[in-house]
Swiss-Prot record:
Coiled coil: none annotated. It comes from Orientia tsutsugamushi (strain Boryong). InterPro entries: DNA_mismatch_repair_MutS, DNA_mismatch_repair_MutS-lik_N, DNA_mismatch_repair_MutS/MSH, DNA_mismatch_repair_MutS_C, DNA_mismatch_repair_MutS_clamp, DNA_mismatch_repair_MutS_core, DNA_mismatch_repair_MutS_N, DNA_mismatch_repair_MutS_sf. ATP binds at residues 641-648. One of its GO terms (molecular function) is ATP-dependent DNA damage sensor activity. Keywords: ATP-binding, DNA damage, DNA repair, DNA-binding, Nucleotide-binding. This is DNA mismatch repair protein MutS. The keyword ATP-binding applies. This protein is involved in the repair of mismatches in DNA. It is possible that it carries out the mismatch recognition step. This protein has a weak ATPase activity. It holds the Pfam family MutS_IV. Belongs to the DNA mismatch repair MutS family. One of its GO terms (biological process) is mismatch repair.
């Protein structure tokens, strides 16, 4: 941020025109924003903003005269096209300051002469975390703004969705912060600028660097936060909003302060923050959330994610609630079973589900409509959404009432049913005021029925029937003056006037006729009536539009008085949509109801992968189901087998089954008994973290470290190929010791896939570990994958067979087989090792080329620069050529 003096010097402020000086004054206070500066019917951008935005939006970069002897860069956006351009700016994480004209040029001239500059002011700052417009925001995804305050080893997170008036505060341990951030996925994060000097804490936000908004330390002070909260909610003491600790108060205050600055005159009215306990929810670490592709694929797409498969919701608010369910599975048995009871109730009443879905899909996005109404940013269609929702709510209630009267319904269903209300008074008010069809009406006028307001009806009559009014007045004056040729005329100089011929002018005797002009052939007059009619005609459209906006504000106020009930109604409709969705997909996909217990049970019969099953079904193929029984004597499954045989799919499908069960949905299996999982961890796949300079192996070890440190006996841990990112020596040692630690220290349920066949002998030492492998058919060196998990251990990796399927050259494959035979002469013997930890492992290494291997063994890949790596490659090449020459000699 530049100082005022530096800013003015940079832009040569004192050489600017008065309007450009006004622009620079406003830009100085909004240096972090792209400034859209309203000039007539356009938003204009200058200097660097013009250059950036013209490239981003494909606009013509023009010039607006000269400034300080140089062309002034400028581009513009038509004001009526703003909403079509804004999304592209917001998607690129730009803040946009909207500067509007507060008066017309005519008003400015009256105020301060012809040189006056029109008053302008930033009325709103649009950011990715504070938007509410439909055109700027994804319909089925929450849009969170977060503020985080860290004290010692606890992070207090306040986060809100302005578009739905949701506000939550939660405390998490620092080591769980990245997992929590991946769950919330905030669009903006407000942090203290002091964190910029703490590299350790700042590393926790590596994936969110573009979303961080730094504020000065005082922004988060407890005393300031108290004042902000008291002013925002108009309360005497912050005790009124709940028992918040000091860091939670600071986080809540930071959010409210940020909103007040960004939204200027249109301030959100968030409810009191809901204090959430972490204990009731399953923790899914960031790696697991990513690798399981819960809400988006690894490439960032919705299609192909788990959510894309299970989302058949019919409303936007239902889609958002399902997104929250999937992001935040429950970890409390009674809460999970309450949800499952509702899902089961609807599953047993599929005709009811069909009837409800037909009704619910007619409900607009009442949640976001209500939020826009509360912040005075409502459009007519938002009020229409409330009206439609009130009407349909009665039909939904009537449909549910039929089954409730029969009894034997889940208690939780009554909690969903009770908020369904059809407020006749509010509905009739909206119905009497709003046009029945708003699809063809503009947002600023033409949406209120004429019959609702006598004054509006008069104005519209004037607009549509002005010629009739003029004709009636002309006939009246002819009768009063006895001049049959009297006319009412109009020109640009005099406006409307009464005209009679010179010879008839003497007949005008009434004083109400005021002389305006005499010409060679006629005399012109005016009257108060005519002037009033002319003024009304000129102002009728403006007055009608203003009156409609007044009526809109009155209707919004009436809705605001019922906002709490309407919010509960929206939640009920969302819940009905989600649970009907669960019943619908469970029936369509042949899912079963899981049994959730408080012990460590885990018995899946004929489990399937929800996503892959749907993808291959489209190809008319069948998914091979598999059992998984992680019970007492086999809490750990050590799974060996070749690549492409289905190990990773099996690992993922069991994690997905757990998640689906704990959100209250049926699962893809014949049966499922699951002891509630408190934390879900996975280490699947290999990827360098180039941004932070971490190699594949370092990423793998960091994630494994987190798993070993945070897992409990109630957790589910999924590990795939631990140790493969380093040498075979180290890899086996690490995988071995991790297995021992999970078995003897954590004692949790675990699926562990590996290519280190030497580990299978651990089954004779670790009593709760069982070996499983993937069934294959190997005939005459022709390999067929059967995708069935069976008890036992793979006797070889079949890696060369897979390489053959991939199309490696025959000469390479033959050489690989030769090397494999040499390696298999000397295997790791686990039974002869120390019981507690691997001391040493003896693996034969081909004797050729010895010098090359020695060079590689001395390398530390994590510390190499690209230039050093290239140099070493040349060195290895030369060494190999030299050794080949020596061999030939």
């Amino acid at each position: 941020m530049l100082t005022k003096e530096d800013f003015r010097n940079k832009y040569q402020y004192h050489q600017a025109t008065p309007m450009l000086q006004q622009y620079l004054d406003i830009k100085f206070t909004h240096q972090c924003c792209i400034l859209l500066f309203r000039v007539g019917d356009f938003y204009e951008l200058f200097f660097d903003d013009a250059i950036v935005v013209s490239k981003l939006l494909g606009l013509i970069l023009a010039k607006k005269g000269k400034h300080a002897g140089q062309d002034l860069p400028m581009c513009g956006i038509p004001y009526h096209a703003l909403e079509s351009y804004l999304p592209r700016l917001v998607e690129q994480e730009h803040k946009v300051a909207l500067c509007e004209q507060l008066e017309s040029p005519e008003e400015a001239k009256k105020r301060n002469g012809y040189k006056a500059v029109v008053k302008r002011e930033v009325v709103r700052i649009i950011t990715s975390g504070t938007i509410t417009e439909e055109s700027l925001i994804k319909a089925n995804v929450p849009n969170y703004l977060a503020a985080i305050v860290i004290h010692k080893d606890i992070a207090s997170i306040g986060y809100c969705d302005v578009s739905t008036a949701e506000f939550i505060v939660i405390d998490v341990a620092i080591h769980n912060l990245t997992s929590e951030l991946s769950r919330i996925n905030p669009k903006e994060i407000i942090l203290s600028e002091s964190l910029q000097h703490n590299s350790g804490l700042l590393a926790l936000f590596d994936n969110y660097k573009q979303k961080i908004v730094y504020q000065v330390e005082s922004y988060f002070s407890f005393n300031k936060a108290q004042r902000v909260i008291q002013n925002y909610y108009e309360i005497i003491t912050i005790d009124s909003i709940g028992s918040l600790n000091s860091t939670q108060v600071s986080a809540v205050g930071a959010i409210l302060e940020y909103l007040s600055i960004m939204q200027k005159h249109s301030k959100s009215k968030l409810p009191f923050p809901q204090i959430v306990s972490y204990e009731n929810f399953m923790l899914i670490d960031a790696s697991a959330r990513k690798n399981l592709e819960l809400t988006s694929t690894l490439s960032g797409n919705f299609k192909g994610s788990l959510l894309s498969i299970i989302d058949a919701t019919v409303t936007n608010q239902g889609g958002r609630l399902l997104h929250k369910f999937l992001s935040t599975p429950l970890a409390e048995v009674n809460l999970i079973n309450s949800r499952l009871q509702i899902t089961d109730f609807f599953y047993q009443n599929l005709q009811l589900v069909e009837n409800l879905r037909q009704l619910v899909k007619l409900v607009p996005d009442i949640e976001r409509a209500l939020s826009r109404i509360l912040i005075a940013k409502a459009l007519p269609k938002d009020l229409e959404s409330i009206k439609i929702s009130l009407k349909i709510a009665l039909s939904i209630k009537k449909e549910l009432n039929k089954v409730l009267e029969e009894g034997n319904t889940p208690k939780y269903l009554e909690e969903i049913y009770n908020p369904l209300f059809g407020d006749n008074e509010l509905y009739e008010l909206l119905d009497s005021a709003l046009l029945d069809d708003l699809s063809n009406s503009a947002n600023d006028c033409g949406f209120i029925k004429s019959s609702y307001s006598t004054k509006l009806e008069e104005l519209r009559n004037l607009i549509h029937n002005s010629s009739n009014f003029i004709e009636q007045l002309k006939l009246q004056y002819r009768q009063e003056t006895c001049i049959e040729t009297l006319k009412i005329c109009h020109n640009n100089v005099w406006g409307m006037f009464i005209e009679v011929s010179s010879k008839n002018a003497h007949k005008i005797t009434d004083s109400k006729f005021v002389h305006k002009q005499t010409t060679t052939t006629a005399v012109r007059f005016t009257t108060t009536e005519l002037q009033t009619l002319e003024a009304k005609m000129l102002n009728a459209k403006t007055m009608a539009a203003a009156l409609e906006q007044e009526i809109l504000a009155e209707l919004c106020k009436a809705i605001s008085l019922k906002s709490e009930k309407l919010s509960h109604l929206a939640k009920s409709i969302s819940l009905i949509d989600v649970f009907c969705n669960f019943a619908y997909i469970s029936h369509e996909y042949n899912y079963c109801r899981p049994e959730i217990t408080s012990d460590l049970a885990f018995n899946i019969v004929d489990g399937r992968h929800a996503v892959i099953e749907k993808l291959i079904t489209k190809k008319h193929e069948s998914f091979i189901s598999n059992d998984c029984n992680l019970q007492n004597d086999q809490r750990i499954w050590l799974i060996t087998g070749p690549n492409m045989a289905g190990k990773s799919t099996f690992l993922r499908q069991n994690a997905i089954i757990v998640i689906l069960a704990q959100i209250g949905c049926y699962v893809p299996a014949q049966s499922a008994q699951i002891g509630v999982v408190d934390k879900l961890f996975s280490r699947i796949g290999a990827a360098d973290d180039l941004a932070s300079g971490q190699s594949t192996f370092m990423v793998e070890m960091v994630e494994t470290s987190v798993i070993l440190a945070q897992s409990t006996f109630m957790s589910l841990v999924i590990l795939d190929e631990i140790g493969r990112g380093t040498s075979t020596y180290d890899g086996i040692s690490i995988a071995w010791s991790c297995l021992e630690y999970i078995h003897s220290n954590i004692r949790c349920r675990c699926l562990f896939a590996t290519h280190y066949h030497e580990l299978v002998d651990l089954a004779s030492k670790l009593l709760s570990l069982k070996n499983f492998t993937v069934k294959i058919h190997d005939s005459n060196d022709k390999l067929s994958f059967l995708y069935k998990i069976i008890e036992g251990a793979a006797n070889k990796s079949y890696g060369i067979h897979v390489a053959e399927l991939a199309g490696l050259p025959r000469i390479v494959l033959n050489r690989a087989k030769e090397i494999l035979l040499e390696l298999e002469h000397n295997k790791v013997n686990i039974n002869q090792s120390n019981n507690n930890i691997t001391k040493s492992i003896d693996i034969a290494v081909p004797p050729y080329p010895v010098k090359t291997i020695e060079i590689i063994k001395q390398l530390n890949p994590d510390q190499l620069t690209p230039k050093e790596a290239l140099s070493i490659i040349y060195k290895i090449k030369n060494t190999i050529l030299l050794e080949e020459d020596e061999k030939m000699i």
